[in-house]
UniProtKB/Swiss-Prot annotation:
The gene is hutG. This is Formimidoylglutamase. Mn(2+) 1 binds at H120, D148, D152, D233. CDD domains: Formimidoylglutamase. Mn(2+) 2 binds at D148, H150, D233, D235. Binds 2 manganese ions per subunit. It catalyses: N-formimidoyl-L-glutamate + H2O = formamide + L-glutamate. Pathway: Amino-acid degradation; L-histidine degradation into L-glutamate; L-glutamate from N-formimidoyl-L-glutamate (hydrolase route): step 1/1. Pfam families: Arginase (PF00491). The keyword Transferase does not apply. Keywords: Histidine metabolism, Hydrolase, Manganese, Metal-binding. Belongs to the arginase family. The lineage of its organism: Bacteria, Bacillati, Actinomycetota, Actinomycetes, Mycobacteriales. Catalyzes the conversion of N-formimidoyl-L-glutamate to L-glutamate and formamide. It comes from Nocardia farcinica (strain IFM 10152).
Length: 310
């Protein structure tokens, strides 16, 4: 685990009305106040490389921290940074297991983990954490909501950024519900649609994601589960909004619709963990993608995590 970097940014004052994220995020240590947000980085693009994508997402966690650090807070917040799980060389599976252990430990300690990627291979590591935590008690119906242009259900010979949800569904069967909002038909072969149908995957195409339809899709999904893992692949957004990804979207889901979806999930009381995938700073334009991702995470955390007492 790489230690948490220092969050820095503009300081207008130290009283509550002046606070920004960089002034409230502290290094995480066991025994930290429960019911807090804990940020974790996952520095990996080995899965993207294996999936024949454009590498660079390993730099995503720190770029996301830098974009979020100067954002102003409406009220005082309590947050921690647990550092970054770093995938060294080709040791993706080892990194995913390490991420899973970190996420499980945070959940068991009563925290809300927010994981910064990294390629979408992050998803298998985050899932291992949820599956291995006490939050998933016997009989708990776990759901994964993926905001993504791709199913990520490939049957590749080795795990990659294109395989995590097939790995999960192959292991879990009907014990996990999986839904994808924002699917781009031209970016997924007929074979992938067949795989999705075989696994019972619900999906909503990007060109049908008006706010009302998107929220109805999410409501139906949430009604069937007890616990939700939300994963946001930034290539679900239009390329003009999120150019800094391996596979920019020609169409994409508008940001206001995605924000409404995230609000609905946050308000459900079922959200256990969220991660953000595929931020590639080397492909970004004026930090546009990083700032958009930071805005979404800011919104989710401030809506989901209670304000500390006193």
């Amino acid at each position: 685990m790489r230690p948490a970097p220092r969050w820095t940014g503009r300081t207008d004052g130290t009283t509550d009305e002046h606070l920004r994220w960089h002034q409230v995020v502290a290094p995480y240590a066991p025994g930290a106040e429960p019911n807090s947000c804990v940020f974790v980085g996952f520095a990996s693009d080995e899965g993207v490389r294996r999936n024949k994508g454009r590498v660079g997402a390993a730099a995503g966690p720190d770029a996301l921290r830098q974009a979020m650090a100067p954002m102003a807070l409406d009220r005082p917040r309590r947050a921690y940074d647990a550092g970054t799980v770093e995938v060294v060389g080709e040791a993706l599976e080892e990194g995913q297991r390490a991420l899973g252990g970190t996420v499980a430990g945070l959940l068991d300690a009563g925290h809300f983990p927010v994981v910064f990627g990294g390629g979408h291979e992050i998803a298998y590591g985050t899932y291992l954490g949820v599956a291995g935590s006490s939050r998933r008690a016997p009989g708990t119906r776990l759901g994964i909501l993926n905001l993504d242009a791709h199913f990520d259900l490939r049957a590749d010979p080795v795990p990659s950024s294109g395989t995590p949800f097939r790995q999960i569904l192959a292991a879990e069967g009907d014990a996990v519900r999986y839904a994808v909002l924002g699917i781009s038909q031209p970016s997924n072969t007929a074979a992938l649609f067949d795989t999705a149908a075989r696994f019972g995957v619900r999906h909503l195409p990007d060109d049908e994601c008006d706010p009302a339809t998107a929220l109805a899709f999410v409501d139906a999904f949430l009604a069937e589960i007890d616990l939700v893992y939300l994963t946001i692949d930034l290539d679900v957004l239009p390329a003009a909004v999120a150019p800094g990804v391996s596979a920019p979207a020609a169409f994409g889901v508008p940001l206001p619709t995605l924000q409404a979806v995230c609000d609905r999930v946050s308000a459900s009381g079922k959200l256990a963990v969220v991660d953000v995938a595929e931020l590639n700073p080397g492909l970004d334009i004026d930090n546009r993608t990083a700032r958009t991702a930071a805005r979404l995470i800011h919104r989710i955390v401030t809506r989901h995590v209670p304000v500390p007492a006193g």
